[in-house]
Amino acid sequence: CGLRKGGKHYFALDITDTLSPKYLWEFPKTPGVLDRIGQSWSEPAIGRVKIEQGGDLVEKWVAFIGGGYDPYDEKKGTEATTGNIFFVIDILTGEMIKEFSGLVLMRHSFPAPPTAVDTNQDGYVDKVYVGDLAGQMWVFDVSFDEISKTSDSQWKGQRLFMAPKDLLEKHNCYYQPAVA
């Protein structure tokens, strides 16, 4: 879970034994990543993916986490100084598997929880949807294609939708998108 307005970190606990929970990890682990994260509002979406590791494909349980809330990004005409980044984290170790940043038009923070979707019903997440503070909806393709053998090195993100610019206020996205 995230610290929300109290900080920029996420942490994981093993609560298999509810009488004796165990600390697992904290993210981020490096100052360079921490400098780019906003307040950790985003409740992670959890799912399985296939990734390439040492030339082999392995199954991983992951957390999908938005880059966080940047209070400066709420003002019309401004862009985020932090939080305009999206992560895929190994849920057992807290290690970052993938960082989506620097994409065209990815200039606003991601405080909302993402929605992970298994589009082909194979038990693995294929798409992750999340909104940003500019009213943009993003989709991150984290699928594995058995035919072309695409894996995490080919994962990509793109803007799916943008709220109309002619409106007086920005359309900040604070809530998890519903996907049907």
Q: Can you say where each PLM-predicted feature lies in the sequence?
A:
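Extracytoplasmic/lumenal domain signature
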Residues: 1-180
